[in-house]
A protein has these predicted regions:
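N-terminal binding-site loop/beta-alpha segment at the start of enzyme catalytic domains
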Residues: 1-70, 190, 277-279
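Short, well-ordered coil/turn segments that N-cap beta-strands
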Residues: 11-16, 42-45, 67-70, 99-103, ...
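Active-site mouth loops of central-metabolism enzymes
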Residues: 19-29, 74-84, 108, 113
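Short, acidic/polar
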Residues: 26-38, 82-97, 142-145, 170
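A short, structured active-site edge motif that brings together acidic residues
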Residues: 69-81, 104-108, 138, 161-163
Length: 279
């Protein structure tokens, strides 16, 4: 599995990781098996959040006995992101995950608490060894500028954002900003939200043709397209061990410049929206 830098963090992570949104305790055995299969195949970057319900508990079971292999990320809700609230939320997440540390802790989206307070909480956790690094999620350029000035300069590890073929808004300004400032960009929901292009659509046919040329699947082609720039990482969710294996295979896929151009033309970048989209 190809590995890339994670902002200023002194550790590289796999280009394809594992997301856990909508994983719940009702499907625990299947979810645990999928996550463990992903680990076996090198997808050691696992992303979760306190907002995801039982996901942290499921992740804790999946990584039991393998914690040192994992680059573990969770997120604090903006409503909890005061200085003391950030520390308390992290400690609750650590308990659910059954670990003593996170590799990165994110503010889930901009909220009402001053960023200086949240970042002070992050730094307190880092000093205590409970987190290695910290970052952001769903931050547009004005929010990123504010975060940089509020104490984030040289410290923001990543910005996790919505990014898929039908939603390429980050390419207008967010992605260039992050690249200029040395911040990793992590794509969540890389297959969209129930709107993955079907094989009979014009764009879907392009994906299928390219996939056939490589002995791959359309989803693997999409993942590879989304991480075509060195600053990009992706965290698809897998519903089964087989699905995890399919996602992992995208890490070894290589697309030609001509193929990347075909995909780019089939799913063109839309005009810049007023706000950065998020789920």
């Amino acid at each position: 599995m190809e590995r890339r830098p994670f902002g200023p963090v002194p550790r590289e992570v796999p280009v394809i990781g594992q997301g856990t949104w909508y994983i719940d305790d009702a499907h625990r055995p299947t979810a645990v098996a999928a996550l463990r299969r992903g680990l076996d195949l090198g997808m050691t970057h696992i992303d979760t959040a306190e907002m995801y319900g039982d996901a942290e508990i499921v992740v804790g079971e999946a990584i039991a006995g393998r914690r040192d292999e994992v680059f573990l990320v969770s997120k604090v809700l903006p409503t909890n992101a005061s200085r003391a609230g950030t520390v308390a939320a992290c400690e609750r997440s650590l308990a659910r995950l059954r670990t003593d540390r996170l590799d990165c802790y994110l503010l889930h989206w901009p909220g009402s608490h001053p960023l200086e307070e949240t970042f002070a909480g992050f730094e307190r956790l880092r000093e205590q060894g409970k987190i290695l690094s910290w970052g952001l999620s769903n931050f547009d350029v004005p929010d990123l500028d504010a975060a940089w000035k509020a104490g984030g300069e040289g410290r923001i590890a990543c910005n996790q954002v919505l990014y898929h073929l039908g939603e390429r808004a980050i390419e207008h300004a967010v992605l260039p900003w992050c690249e200029e400032h040395g911040v990793a960009v992590v794509a969540y929901s890389p297959f969209g939200h129930g709107d993955f292009p079907g094989p009979r659509t014009p764009g879907g046919r392009v994906l299928e043709e390219i996939a056939a040329r490589h002995g791959a699947t359309a989803r693997q082609v999409v993942l590879r397209f989304l991480v075509r720039r060195p600053s990009l990482l992706a965290i698809p969710k897998a519903s089964s061990a087989e699905h995890a294996a399919d996602n992992a295979a995208a890490g070894a896929l290589r697309l030609t410049d001509a193929e990347l151009a075909r995909i780019d033309a089939a799913f063109p970048l839309a005009p810049r929206p007023r706000r950065l989209p998020m789920l």
